[in-house]
């Protein structure tokens, strides 16, 4: 399965921590909720539920030339793909390859998921 998705928020901006009274909670940020909705829309109504061991190739096209750690977008992206129903859990992934490509306006990621 191949998908072209918007550039995801980094792991540093994916979750937010809130304290209500004495209780602390970790919630998805607004950026993360919007990104998940975009991934679900790109996958479609009936996603293929892959059940075996998986390989994932991610091509990252950053929105600008700022220095970024490309591993900071892996976890949010993989979680969103699982939430969209591509696979049951990202623990199914045995092979993961991430490459940084040239900058494009707005940024994007191209994801290929294959069964091994």
Model-derived regions, located:
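Acidic, proline/glycine-enriched N-terminal capping motif
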Residues: 1-116
